[in-house]
């Protein structure tokens, strides 16, 4: 029996490996077929994540509308996509559109341009985001408004402009690439966290409103999207619980990982996705069920960072 088991084990492992390979290939092909011929609008396509989303959806055969506020960088992205396109597979030439979401006045015209060109939008990926970090009392109200325009008013203005077309056709999907700070705030990121809370609240409400029209609202929330070559600095991060938490939080996820998750979200029509390791995920639940403990840990971390002495 022992000899037979030893002989069967390699065959079993080989069989499992084969099944996993088949599953991965089927999933990959299914992902591509889910966006084939679909009109997909990607905002801030010239960012790290925007480029990766453009690559994934272009390979999948989508009719891309790439939005960005720098024409030269849009053209560079266009050239990169065309140069790596597989001639044996059906792909479409992307449409380039200048769009700065912080300038809300131009958003309706951009939406009209896209609808006039294609007649519809099947998938909108709200990817644009502007970050700011600093003590709340040192951030000007003007900067607060700028961040809210880019991260909240811009995306919802574009969404509102394209949504009637989706409702009338009774089909469509809107993906908000948000941030885990839409669930809980981190010190010195008050304005950014506020904009992410606002965006998440809007799309959570919208999800229920448009469900009867078969329009899907999805949110993808990573800890943060790191650049291609930036990694956390080494340091004495193990000194306390809060430092361990923030150390885990700062690793973030790579743009390639997020782009692939956005594709899976579109394919499976997921409603909410968190991309984080267990520590930040646990923090979401701690914030919900044990808020006083959560606030105490975060406040303790701020005091240590600023070297503020304890009272008494």
Curated annotation (Swiss-Prot):
Pfam families reported for this sequence: adh_short
Enzyme class: oxidoreductase
UniProt-listed InterPro entries: NAD(P)-bd_dom_sf, Sc_DH/Rdtase_CS, SDR_fam, SDR_family_member_7C
Active site, per annotation: 192 (proton acceptor)
Subcellular location: Sarcoplasmic reticulum membrane
The keyword NAD is assigned to this record: yes
Family classification: Belongs to the short-chain dehydrogenases/reductases (SDR) family.
Protein name: Dehydrogenase/reductase SDR family member 7C
Organism: Homo sapiens
Gene: DHRS7C
């Amino acid at each position: 029996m022992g000899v037979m088991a030893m002989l069967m084990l390699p065959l079993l492992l080989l069989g499992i490996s084969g099944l996993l390979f088949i599953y991965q290939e089927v999933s990959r092909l299914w992902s591509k077929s889910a966006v084939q011929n679909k009109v997909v609008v990607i905002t801030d396509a010239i960012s790290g994540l925007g480029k990766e989303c453009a690559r994934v959806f272009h390979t999948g055969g989508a009719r891309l509308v790439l939005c960005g506020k720098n024409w030269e960088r849009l053209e560079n992205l266009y050239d990169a996509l065309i140069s790596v396109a597989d001639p044996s597979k059906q792909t479409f030439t992307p449409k380039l559109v200048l769009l700065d979401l912080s300038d809300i006045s131009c958003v309706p015209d951009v939406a009209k341009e896209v609808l006039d060109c294609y007649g519809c939008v099947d998938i909108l990926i709200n990817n644009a985001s502007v970050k700011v970090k600093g003590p709340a009392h040192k951030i000007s109200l003007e900067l607060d408004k700028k961040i809210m325009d880019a991260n909240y008013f811009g995306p919802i203005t574009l969404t509102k402009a394209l949504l009637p077309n989706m409702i009338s056709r009774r089909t469509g999907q809107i993906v908000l690439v948000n941030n885990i700070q839409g669930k809980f705030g981190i010190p010195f990121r008050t304005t950014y966290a506020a904009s992410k809370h606002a965006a998440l609240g809007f799309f959570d409400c919208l999800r229920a409103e448009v469900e009867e029209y078969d329009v899907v609202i999805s949110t993808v929330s990573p800890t943060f999207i790191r650049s291609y070559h930036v990694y956390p600095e080494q340091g004495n991060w193990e000194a306390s619980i809060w430092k361990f938490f923030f150390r885990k939080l700062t690793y973030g996820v790579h743009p390639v990982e997020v782009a692939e998750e956005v594709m899976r979200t579109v394919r499976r029509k997921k409603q909410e996705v968190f991309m984080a390791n267990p520590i930040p995920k646990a923090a979401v639940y701690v914030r919900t069920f044990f808020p006083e403990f959560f606030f105490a840990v975060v406040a303790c971390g701020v005091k240590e960072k600023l070297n503020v002495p304890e009272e008494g």
